[in-house]
C-alpha cells in the first residue's frame, strides 16, 4: 500500500489565513477593475462606495487618490442581500458572479478564475511564510528580495502561471525559494543559432557557467553521440521546460542527435519574479540565465522569440557604447545597464513552417545570458528591485521607511533622494537619446549604500526598449538588425510608456503606501517628484526642445489597462502575436494636478 505524506505547506490552507488573503485579493480586484473602468463605482458619501451591476450591489470603504485609483479597505467589503449586508471575501465567487454580467465570454471567465485561483494559492503561501519585519526586509539583497515580492501590483492575476502544477509551483517559483539546478543540452548548429558580443563564445560562456571539469564531461557526452563543439552549441534549459516541452515536442530531434542531453550544472539558482529568469546563488557574480518556460503568466507565454534572442547582444554592445559616451549617465548617475551578452534560439522543424502558428510554439527553446547585478556593485553597495519599495514587513513598517531610518534620513528626504536617483537617468535616456526603457518594479533595481539610494540599474532591453520614430542623431548608429526588432513609435507614446511603467506601475502604489503608513501625503510625494524633474531640466537648458517633445507636464495621459486585455480584448486566445495593451480614457498627471487644484482653490 502506498503511503503519502501531506504535500501542502502547513498554514497556507488554514481557514483564517485563506479568508485574510482572499479579502486582500478581492480588494485588489475591485481597485484595479474600478481603475480600468471594468465597472463603475458610485461614491455614496466621503470614503464610502457602491458598485451596481444589474441586481447586484456591493459596498465598501476606500480612499480615492490622484490617478482616480481607490485604496479599498478589505474588511469593509459587503454584498447587499435584501435589506442587510453580508461580508464579502471570495474573489473567485465575485468574478464568477460579476464578469458574465459585464459581457465577459464564458470561456474567458472560467480561465480567468483559474488564473486568479493560482494567484490566490500563491498569496496564501507568501502570507504563511511571511516572517520579516520592515527593517529585516531592508537588509536583503536583490536575489533574496525576489522571494518576498508579490508580482506586478496592477495585474490581478499576477501569479497565474498556467501550466505549473502544485509540485512545480513549490519547486520553481520565487516565493518558495527552492534552489534549482539548470539542465544543459547540446544543440545542433544546423537548427540552433548563437549570437554574442564579439569577445564572447558559446564555449567560454558555458565554461564560466559550469566550470572546466563539468564542461569537459559535457564534451565527452557530446562525443558519445557523435557530436562536438564544432557541430553543437551548448544551451541551458529550465528543468520544467525539458520535462513538459522539449522531450514531448522535440523527441525526433533528440532521437536524431540534434539535441543531446548533457546533464546538470553544479551551481544552484533561484528564480526571479518572472519565474523563468534564474539568478546564480552559488556564484552571484555569474550571469543570470533567461530561459524559456511555456507557461502563461501576466499576459503572455514565457518563451523567447528567436529574433529577440539573436539581437540582444548587438543591442547591449550599442547601449554600452552609448553609456560610455554620455558622462551624465555614466559618471554622474552611475547608471548600470545589465547587458544581455548572448542569446540562442533553436528552430523547431515543423512549428516554424506553419504560417500563423501561435507564438508559443516557436518560442520553446532559447536562452539569454544577462549580467548579474552583483558583478556591477561597488564595495558596500546592495540592490533592491523597485518592487520592494511597495512592500511592508510583518510589523506593518514599509521597506521605504526602514531604509530611511537605516540611512538617517526622514521618509521625505529619502523619497526625494530616490527620485533624484531614478527619474533623471530614465528621462535622460528618453530626452537625449530617444529611448524609452521599461522601468517598472521588476526591471529597475535601486542600488543603495547604508540604506541610501545611490544608483539605478536597468534590464530587459531587447524585450522592452522602444525607439522614438524621430530621427535623433544620438540613435542614428543603432544597428539596423536591432532597429528592425525594437518598436519604433511617436514621442507621445514613449513619454506615456515611461509615465505608465514608472509613475503608474510603481509610484502610484508607493505613494498610497507612504500616505497610509509613513505620514508622507500624496501631494507631498508628487511634489518631490516634480522638483526632481525640474532640477534635471534646469541642468540641461540646451535640451529645451527635447523636453517640449517629451513633455512630462501635460495635464493628463492615457489610462493603460492590462486586466481589460485579459477580460475583453484578447482573453485567452492562442494567437501568432503577443497581445497589446488597452487604453480607457485619461488620468490626471500628478506632476501638475496638485498645483492646479491649489490654484483653483
Swiss-Prot record:
Pfam annotation, one family: IucA_IucC
The organism's place on the tree of life at top rank: Bacteria
Keyword field: Plasmid
GO molecular function: acid-amino acid ligase activity
Record-level GO BP terms: rhizobactin 1021 biosynthetic process; siderophore biosynthetic process
Pathway the protein takes part in: Siderophore biosynthesis; rhizobactin biosynthesis
Family as reported in the entry's similarity comment: Belongs to the IucA/IucC family.
The protein, known as: Rhizobactin siderophore biosynthesis protein RhbF
Organism name: Rhizobium meliloti (strain 1021) (Ensifer meliloti)
Gene designation per UniProt: rhbF
